[in-house]
């Protein structure tokens, strides 16, 4: 589908935009700090933005009560434990998860949730790990646990310019996996793990939630990375039932940081075997007897003392998001994304060449509010993303550049092959820039912008104005030297 060559002059002119007007009202009241000093925030995939009401609620709660370590039974401990328990129930309620089927484990972040699953999963020769190229490094890292257990690790490639996984490839890999063999051999206890993101943090592609059931029918547990999906999309666990869901709360509503969650089906959680124990995770332990008994609920996975002063803020954030409406946020983000893609597609140099190269879908279908792209000079060469980061910062735009901790999606977007990467590594390179030069890549990353709960039309318009006024018809070789790349 080709973008409309004459897009609307402003997102506000789009059909349906007026129906999302409450977002504009909230921006002017609860999120007015976003407009301080002419800043434009375009990194919701990196972190959400806290409403002023959230900060006030945290302040008021701490001043009105006294709370202490919930691992005790004194009044202040009971008060803290009560708030933590209320937050657990709020999480299940928000995601429409049956408390008899699901439980909530609080973690430091989504990465911590992934690690809990990886370190405790029963991998082995007949329990493989299946991943997509399009995964955050916190999910990719699970492969190290699988390999240490001598399990096979299979990756599903991305196809075409939209950077999607072909479902036929997924079915073929799942059917060929040892999980299916184990079932045929009459060993239903040993399963495989399939881990993928509901939404790509690189391209914004939304991978089908129907893959959860597809994999489970083939004997796999499913870990769904919802960190990029949940802030602007409804995840209903009464309809889609992954075995594990990883989340970071600051990505949903900006605050608190340092708190994430693993939502786990109780049946899947019972199959995990933790390699160690810590304070708060055990019912009893003996030093001389060399034995321990883990707790029999979610606390067996919550190491040490929980962040009991911040976890109650999760409940406030969920109530806040629910009062606004996830569907309303989804609609606003979809409109801004569609408009931006149309506008970027119309930007062309006087040479006729495109100014913007988008990685991923060029329409709003099957994607979220994350748009990743590179800019091109009139001669077709790429503008270094480090230059864009520097000049965007000067213009007051907060965006992201690099590979966004998603190397597989970047490799797919830039057309990098496994053979070429291995050859370059064997040749010996010491720096990121040397590696990129050896691969023949014109740049080491891309530019990512993302919309979220408080995004408004002027955010998208300011971005387009910046791109057009700064890079349209700008020749290569006019930039000042850039610092070396220290990481992707």
Language model regions located:
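Pyridoxal 5′-phosphate
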Residues: 1-488
